[in-house]
């Protein structure tokens, strides 16, 4: 039932006292012709409605959330407390810089810390999410070559295992996207060599990649990319695996985008809020979006980079997310962040070892923070697909992994347990998944009709995507 269906004419959740200020009528041209169709409910009905909706949701505060390539780690509540401090909560972006020195200092110091973590020379905090950061990075690439008069570079090379946003971001900026083939789950260096020429503007990579494998030829790839005059772009989706161990800048990357809402522990999902800072090496610093923050003596000021691509978002980005990420980094410290990556990799390898007993691991061996399993054999022998397995997992009160990604693995399950889950939780999750796979052979219909115990049963996802309903009534 929607909040509109609970509406009863005349019910109110809040009443204002009578006002002694004389009434003033607005001109007719500003008035609605009909009253807005807003729900009329009492406060108890309002609270109960949204409380019941919340109880139907799942979050990392309820249990493991192993979506691959999403880094759904537990988010310390201290971060929320910091972001809710009055000095951060009650400011306005139009205030004079003299009155928001604390906020500017936080942004300046956060940039410095992120540059140290990634090996970049400067950074913008404006982008609102990872894909937005990618778009910003591609705009910088385009402007860089335009400024050099090198207008013939129209191609961006992207691995076949890449996130879908990689080719989308490059395409939106006007580049032609060319796919690099994989070999043993990593970039095929020989295929890359054939594709690199004077028309290539950039190569976009994730390292570790979406299969959870570290690109062992990354230094060679960087050298080849730079020799042909192109830039190397780093998708920071999987940075959680390498903090304190290796830096993108030291691998040879020129541009990097991060996902503060993932790696640096701020709640995310359902479209936000996110933050996708973009870091660059020295030769690209002048192309960063404005405004940028700098320190002038004891004051923090805003400035416009000389060759800026312009604004990519209003004001200064999703500022509360910046506060949470800043708090997380200070709380963890350098050793703590390194420990985060160590535990993320350990947990992934432990869980992979449990799961490889009953599911295929196409690219086996040591993984980083995540791994990809395949239910192709299960589907071939039982007719049960990965989607059915994922739906059945819901009946056990936990969230399924990412499914059908990356596209180069048939019937894929992409699993990222993160560093914040303990051994008992990992054991329980493996036990649930094994039980579901066993059930596929013994009672396949139970999976094909799952979930059975959730408030909402299986929906027609194709219909939902093709004919979405955006209104509460037709």
From Swiss-Prot:
Record EC number: 1.4.4.2
GO cellular-component term (any): glycine cleavage complex
Keywords for this protein: Oxidoreductase, Pyridoxal phosphate
Keyword check for Oxidoreductase: yes
GO BP field: glycine decarboxylation via glycine cleavage system
Major enzyme class: oxidoreductase
Source organism superkingdom: Bacteria
Functional summary from the UniProt entry: The glycine cleavage system catalyzes the degradation of glycine. The P protein binds the alpha-amino group of glycine through its pyridoxal phosphate cofactor; CO(2) is released and the remaining methylamine moiety is then transferred to the lipoamide cofactor of the H protein.
HAMAP family referenced in this protein's UniProt entry, alphabetically: GcvPB (MF_00713)
PANTHER family: GLYCINE DEHYDROGENASE (DECARBOXYLATING), MITOCHONDRIAL, GLYCINE DEHYDROGENASE, DECARBOXYLATING
Protein's name in the database: Probable glycine dehydrogenase (decarboxylating) subunit 2
Source species of the chain: Thermotoga maritima (strain ATCC 43589 / DSM 3109 / JCM 10099 / NBRC 100826 / MSB8)
Lineage: Bacteria, Thermotogati, Thermotogota, Thermotogae, Thermotogales
Encoding gene, per UniProt annotation: gcvPB
């Amino acid at each position: 039932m929607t909040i509109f269906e609970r509406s009863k004419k005349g019910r109110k959740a809040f009443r204002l006292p009578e006002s002694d200020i004389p009434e003033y009528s607005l001109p007719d041209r500003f008035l609605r012709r009909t009253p807005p169709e807003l729900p009329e409910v009492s406060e108890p009905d309002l609270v109960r409605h949204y409380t019941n909706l919340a109880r139907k949701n799942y979050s990392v505060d309820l249990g493991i959330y192993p979506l691959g390539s999403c880094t759904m780690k537990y988010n310390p509540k201290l971060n929320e407390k910091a972001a809710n401090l009055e000095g951060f909560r009650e400011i306005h972006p139009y205030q004079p810089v003299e009155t928001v020195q604390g906020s500017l200092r936080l942004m300046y110091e956060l940039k410095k810390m992120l540059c140290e973590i990634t090996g970049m020379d400067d950074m913008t905090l404006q982008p609102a999410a990872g894909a937005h950061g990618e778009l910003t990075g591609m705009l910088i690439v385009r402007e860089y070559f335009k400024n050099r008069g090198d207008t013939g570079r129209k191609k961006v090379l992207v691995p076949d295992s890449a996130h879908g946003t990689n080719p989308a971001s490059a395409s939106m900026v006007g580049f032609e996207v060319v796919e690099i083939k994989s070999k043993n789950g990593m970039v095929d260096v020989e295929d890359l060599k054939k594709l690199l020429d004077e028309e290539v503007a950039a190569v976009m990579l994730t390292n570790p990649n979406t299969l959870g494998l570290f690109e062992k030829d990354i230094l060679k790839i960087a050298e080849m990319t730079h020799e042909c005059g192109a830039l190397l772009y780093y998708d920071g989706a999987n940075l959680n695996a390498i903090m304190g161990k290796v830096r993108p800048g030291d691998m040879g990357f020129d541009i990097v985008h991060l996902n503060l809402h993932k790696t640096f522990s701020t709640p995310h999902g359902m479209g936000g809020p996110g933050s996708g800072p973009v870091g660059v090496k020295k030769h690209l610093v002048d192309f960063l979006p404005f405004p940028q923050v700098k320190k002038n003596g004891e004051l923090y000021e805003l400035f416009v980079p000389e060759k800026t691509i312009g604004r990519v978002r209003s004001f200064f980005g999703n500022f509360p997310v910046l506060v949470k990420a800043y708090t997380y980094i200070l709380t963890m410290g350098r050793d703590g962040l390194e420990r985060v990556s160590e535990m993320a990799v350990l947990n992934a390898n432990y869980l992979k070892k449990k799961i490889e007993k009953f599911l295929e691991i196409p690219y086996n061996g040591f993984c980083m923070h995540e791994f990809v399993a395949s239910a192709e054999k299960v589907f071939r022998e039982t007719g049960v697909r990965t989607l059915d397995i994922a739906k059945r997992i819901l009946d056990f009160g936990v969230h399924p992994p990412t499914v059908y990604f990356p596209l180069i693995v048939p019937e894929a399950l992409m699993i990222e347990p993160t560093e914040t889950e303990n051994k008992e939780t990992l054991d329980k999750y493996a036990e649930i998944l094994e039980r579901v796979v066993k059930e596929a052979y013994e009672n396949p219909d139970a999976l094909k009709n799952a979930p059975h115990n959730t408030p909402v049963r299986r929906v027609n996802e194709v219909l939902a995507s093709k004919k979405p309903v955006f209104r509460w009534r037709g």
